[in-house]
């Protein structure tokens, strides 16, 4: 709420639309969750291949009865993976809706004898689950301030500055957008997860930030690294705080990258100044701990308590011996 007030004082309302991905797994004879899937459907498949279509429909209908407005619902790339997109709304309402959404999905899946998980990477060898965050700012007359029809890409100076702020601070806030040890198993090459700090308005899903093709009142930026394990209040506060910092300091984003970054060599990425996200929770914590920006954003109490909790989690993981080893 403190960060929302800062936006309000600058004349802005922060609007957000999340794309929530999750898996539906079978349960065993005791009702305990497994990682077994009951279908092998793929992106936008339909019945009879998408065997969970009725489950997803039941989830959507129940959410609509609860007052949610659902923008889209479809099968995702991995078997048993699904996406439900919530309608654009103010950030606080969206954060509340994400929390309610996750509880509702788990409850309704259980009615169908399935286990719903928002774990970022529950299975190796397939795509993980993210929660892309679409963002824009509106002025006091509810006009989208990211719009400038005179710009070649239709983006305003405020939009570029907001995006630049996120790109500039993303390493420091990654532990807020990707909070689990498991989050970083998703952020690896080869599974459509964004790991490179760049942006593009082309049909290119390798950069961290994508500018969807819709313009006018629908102009927005899409941050593609967050996953559904986030605390949405902290993650959205971090995104907004970074964006506002970009506006205040009139930051400029780097040149857009319209080529496929995944296929570039390390030398090509280095020459173009393309950096990457932290590769582990431990690395993300180090960047977070050294950030005065994040400490001022969250306040000392939340900043240090969050670090203590996540650092304990990281130390516990490091002491474990995995099956792979």
Q: Which residues does each predicted region cover?
A:
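Glycine-rich, acidic/polar active-site loops that bind/position phosphate-bearing ligands
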Residues: 1-325
């Amino acid at each position: 709420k403190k960060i929302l007030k800062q936006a309000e004082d600058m004349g802005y309302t922060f609007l957000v639309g999340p794309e929530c991905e999750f898996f539906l797994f079978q349960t065993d004879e005791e009702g305990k969750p497994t990682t077994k899937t009951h279908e092998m459907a793929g992106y936008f498949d339909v019945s009879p291949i998408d065997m969970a279509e009725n489950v997803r429909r039941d989830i959507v209908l129940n959410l609509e009865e609860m007052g949610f407005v659902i923008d889209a619902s479809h099968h995702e790339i991995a078997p048993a993976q699904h996406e439900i997109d919530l309608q654009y709304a103010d950030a606080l309402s969206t954060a509340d809706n994400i929390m309610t959404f996750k509880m509702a999905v788990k409850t309704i899946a259980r009615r169908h004898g399935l286990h719903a998980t928002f774990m970022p990477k529950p299975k190796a060898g397939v795509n993980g689950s993210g929660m892309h965050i679409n963002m824009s700012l509106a002025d006091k007359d509810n006009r989208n301030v990211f719009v400038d029809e005179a710009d070649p890409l239709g983006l305003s100076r405020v939009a570029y500055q907001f995006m630049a702020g996120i790109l500039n601070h993303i390493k420091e806030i990654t532990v807020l957008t990707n909070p689990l040890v498991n989050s970083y198993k998703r952020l690896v090459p080869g599974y459509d997860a964004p790991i490179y700090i760049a942006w593009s308005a082309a049909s290119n899903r390798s950069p961290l930030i994508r500018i969807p093709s819709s313009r006018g009142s629908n102009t927005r930026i899409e941050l593609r690294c967050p996953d559904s394990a986030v605390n949405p209040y902290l993650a959205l506060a971090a995104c907004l705080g970074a964006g506002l910092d970009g506006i205040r300091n009139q930051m400029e984003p780097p040149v857009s990258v319209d080529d496929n970054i995944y296929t570039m060599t390390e030398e090509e990425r280095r020459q173009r100044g393309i950096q990457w996200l932290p590769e582990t929770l431990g690395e993300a914590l180090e960047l977070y701990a050294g950030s005065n920006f994040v400490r001022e954003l969250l306040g000392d109490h939340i900043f240090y308590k969050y670090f203590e909790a996540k650092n304990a989690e990281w130390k516990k993981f490091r002491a474990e011996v995995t099956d792979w080893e």
